[in-house]
Structure formats: structure tokens, C-alpha cells
Amino acid sequence: MNVEEEVGKLKEEIQRLGQKQPDGSYKVTFGVIFNDDRCANIFEALVGTLRAAKKRKIVKYDGELLLQGAHDNVEITLLPPPAVAAA
């Protein structure tokens, strides 16, 4: 699986595990994703996938490197897709 595929899977998993917000974003904590069995089977390097998604402005979270235990309560936000301009 390449990085783009992993980021796509990450988006699906955040939608599955997270709470939808009024603005169309989804929020979930790092601990929920990290401790989910399905995510553990999909992502070889969850932190690397999160960093790639953050770099692409698909997700946002505080900090650079998330560590199990220390950052379990850090909120990860899957940003809503950009609005399509009306023609």
C-alpha cells in the first residue's frame, strides 16, 4: 500500500471511529485509533500515516510526533473536504 492509499484508509477509519462535527469534520483521539484492532491490522506505521495526512492538510492535531500513552488524549481532526465552488 502506498502513502496515498494509507491516507485514504486513515480517512475512512477516522470517520468510522470519530464523531462527526457540525462543520463536516470528524474528531477522534489518538488513543482510540491506536488501540483499535482494525487500525492495528491496516497501518504498519500509524504515526507516519498521520504525519503524511497532516502534511497534506487532511488532518490536524497538536504536536509533531504522537506516542502511545503520552498522547492518547490528543484530538485528531479529519478536516472537511474543501467546498466546491458553485458554477
UniProtKB/Swiss-Prot annotation:
One annotated GO biological process: regulation of actin filament-based process
Q: Which InterPro entries match?
A: Costars, Costars_dom, Costars_sf
Per the UniProt entry, what species is this protein from, by scientific name? Oryza sativa subsp. indica
* Name recorded for this polypeptide: Costars family protein
Q: Which SMART domains match?
A: Costars (SM01283)
What start and end residues bound the annotated signal peptide?
none
- Known Gene3D superfamilies for this protein? Costar domain
**Family from the record:** Belongs to the costars family.
User: Which superkingdom?
Assistant: Eukaryota
